Amino acid sequence: MAEVEYRCFVGGLAWATNDESLEQAFSQFGDITDSKIINDRETGRSRGFGFVTFKDEKSMRDAIEGMNGQELDGRNITVNEAQSRGSGGGGGRREGGGGGYGGGGGYGGRREGGGGGGYGGRREGGGGGYGGGGGGYGGRREGGDGGYGGGGGGSRW
């Protein structure tokens, strides 16, 4: 496998939180190599989650321990270890992501970019889930294969 990344998934973020304030909040735990808020490609607005990557495992573990459930910009955040990029889809076990928070459709639809698999994972096109690629609760989108009510964008519910 490629180099190990010590990456935290950070969920429940306020819309106002940006890459810099995310990094600032976590920098007390060790050297950060990357911090990124995931934005909606169409609106440019934060999707309410992001990733912080540390230089070493101890810093990552300390950050998870120290920040999970804490308040950042007025919201209680969730912090846990991110799925590794090579693991496929954390929630969906599908090629190219699937499931989880934002990956492969997940909660809130189609995405490109982001982390890997599970939480916000790498994907282009379809996917399903709530609001996902082929429709579901989020309406008609191009590509993809359904989820709840998916396929052609319709839901029979």
From Swiss-Prot:
Disulfide bonds: none annotated. Keywords: RNA-binding. InterPro entries: Nucleotide-bd_a/b_plait_sf, RBD_domain_sf, RRM2_NsCP33-like, RRM_dom, SLIRP/GR-RBP-like. Residues 6-84 form the RRM domain. Gene3D superfamilies: 3.30.70.330. Residues 70-157 are annotated as: Disordered. Induction: In response to stress by wounding. Residues 86-138, 145-157 have a biased composition (Gly residues). GO terms for molecular function: RNA binding. The keyword Translocase does not apply. May play a role in the biosynthesis and processing of heterogeneous nuclear RNA and in the maturation of specific mRNAs in response to wounding. PANTHER family: HETEROGENEOUS NUCLEAR RIBONUCLEOPROTEIN 87F-RELATED. This is Glycine-rich RNA-binding protein. It comes from Daucus carota (Wild carrot).
